[in-house]
């Protein structure tokens, strides 16, 4: 169960992996983009994972229609606003929404910097007067290669004051972290944090590389850390967080079933691991499902779940005063 006396956070949540099917339909019609279906029910199998995909890259293809329909910057702004509406509807107190400006821009010839500006504007507009707080994490989509990621980074750094971190996501096998060392030097020079997708498609060495060469303070997924006890000790001792995404790891076939998921072992080891959604619309789940269904299936007790909930606040990219304010707010409701 979710402890409502603690803040509820989702700090690994892809904005461009959470585009409503209805919105895809409406934007497709608006921009005369041919979609694989003309109603929500028929569209769902094309934009949502129904059965586990064979691998990460097959899973990621389900996100494509959500960005294919982004025909102008107002469309980008719209999905940013709807992401905040969805987070508030779920009772989330704080979200870190991550997005890849190049991925969102490329299908309809938008400029990544314009996408960044539109997303920031949408988030600022939607959070005014809302019960959910939000920060943004920019993504470098490694799948497009080193040069495109530099363009993407340039677009993000133009608005660095509106971001809390930069992430590296996409094809971990085809484009390993070693290719992006120079990019993350620029990230740290801009005084932004780094959270890296690692140990999802590759093994523990990918996580070591993310920490040692890319300066990661958090690891997205990090499932393969379980293979290396020294790494688990290091994550615990250096307080490097793991953003676990239970259902996602099943749907990408990173883990075969939840009973085998290492989140419970991470928590038992003292690692600051937490529970997140990843791509809610694509997975057909929300944060409540991860806490009430997926976490118990992964062997977590109520105490484990509350620990994971508290860990999310501890590793969130928030100031001490902001964390304290969230704790105070939650404790009095």
Swiss-Prot record:
It comes from the Bacteria. Keywords: Hydrolase, Metal-binding, Nucleotide metabolism, Zinc. GO terms for cellular component: cytosol. Zn(2+) binds at residues 12, 14, 197, 278. GO terms for molecular function: 2'-deoxyadenosine deaminase activity; adenosine deaminase activity; zinc ion binding. Substrate binds at residues 14, 16, 170, 279. SUPFAM superfamilies: Metallo-dependent hydrolases. Gene3D superfamilies: Metal-dependent hydrolases. InterPro entries: A_deaminase, A_deaminase_dom, Ado/ade_deaminase, Metal_Hydrolase. The active site is at 200 (proton donor). Its cofactor is Zn(2+). It catalyses: adenosine + H2O + H(+) = inosine + NH4(+); 2'-deoxyadenosine + H2O + H(+) = 2'-deoxyinosine + NH4(+). GO terms for biological process: adenosine catabolic process; hypoxanthine salvage; inosine biosynthetic process; nucleotide metabolic process; purine ribonucleoside monophosphate biosynthetic process. PANTHER family: ADENOSINE DEAMINASE (PTHR11409:SF43). Catalyzes the hydrolytic deamination of adenosine and 2-deoxyadenosine. This is Adenosine deaminase.
